[in-house]
UniProtKB/Swiss-Prot annotation:
One of its GO terms (cellular component) is plasma membrane. It comes from Mycoplasma genitalium (strain ATCC 33530 / DSM 19775 / NCTC 10195 / G37). It is found in: Cell membrane. Disruption phenotype: Probably essential, it was not disrupted in a global transposon mutagenesis study. Disulfide bonds: none annotated. The lineage of its organism: Bacteria, Bacillati, Mycoplasmatota, Mycoplasmoidales, Mycoplasmoidaceae. The keyword Transmembrane applies. It is a multi-pass membrane protein. The chain crosses the membrane at residues 12-32, 39-59, 90-110, 113-133. This is Uncharacterized protein MG406.
Length: 158
């Protein structure tokens, strides 16, 4: 999977996720403005945004904080970070619970669930797509920087 210690790439992946989410939000807003009766879908789609921002910030900050620790402290902190890394996905349950509890006319539950699943699934897809692309480009760059060195095997006998 993707190495989240690379903050530059982690920021790019997070930005791609939010741009895709914003694109879908604009499409839903256009549909709501043209039809005028699906406001609950718009609110349902927007409900998980604060929780997704919190989750993305925790990914970026946890990786840099964990990388700054020394090896001895890393071994002690692994169990805590494993729990916290798993627990941050529980944050995504909060908007779904809110959409179930609040009157269905305000938040569309299906739109909330789809929007809630949008962030972690797109995060996983981009992480697994990014790794082969990064590997391909690193190999491409390293092949272009190689210089041909004659070893003597290619010379013909006189």
């Amino acid at each position: 999977m993707f190495n989240w210690n690379n903050r530059k790439v982690a920021k790019i992946i997070t930005l791609i996720i939010f741009v895709a989410w914003l694109f879908v939000l604009i499409l839903i807003a256009v549909v709501v403005l043209t039809k005028g009766n699906n406001l609950d879908i718009l609110f349902g789609w927007m409900l998980p945004l604060p929780f997704a921002v919190l989750n993305s910030l925790s990914v970026l900050r946890l990786a840099s904080f964990f990388a700054s620790l020394k090896n001895v402290k890393k071994q002690k902190a692994v169990s805590f970070f494993a729990f916290f890394f798993t627990a941050r996905y529980l944050i995504y349950l909060i908007p779904v619970i809110i959409s179930f509890v609040v009157t269905p006319s305000i938040f569309n539950t299906i739109a909330t669930i789809i929007s809630t699943l949008f962030f972690p699934i797109l995060n996983l897809v981009l992480s697994f797509v990014w790794l082969p692309l990064e590997y391909f480009f690193i190999n491409l760059i390293s092949k272009s920087k190689r210089k041909h060195v004659a070893t003597g095997d290619s010379f013909k006998r006189n």
